[in-house]
């Protein structure tokens, strides 16, 4: 069975033997590896930073993005755009996309959002309708959209290739966590083999992530 309780709970369950496999949306910490846990990356999640389609801003650094979302940078003219008060659009508390974005940019619990929306589509729509807005969304949700544009981050575009080779900064891994020296049950072993194979790639892609098995 699958019990979606968050990365920490999944890791702890494998550690104490109550689960064969844990799913986490972050890499294992050194102390977790020291406890005999192993991670297997099955997918990567690229988080695009989006602005209005007509915005003059095309590139931002991770530091600039963090300063915008924490209210240190408040006007587009500070980062090469036309003058205008920046409107920050984000996801609601508890959103995996928000958690990933804030963890990577170092803005956890310090983002100052003008709007908190409950769907990726809502964020894209809000940014598309406001020339001064900035937001974030999974790469797969932004691809092919002409109502918003994804800025490059440190000169690197948010593409599958850049996520896979690690050059795009705002990304996180999805990992399967197992315990060293523990034999998986037949069902768990079958799932592990499938999840790490090319056969699972289309399912992972449809869920909005970039599969590592090609």
Predicted segments, located by residue:
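Exported/periplasmic ABC-transporter solute-binding proteins
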Residues: 1-214
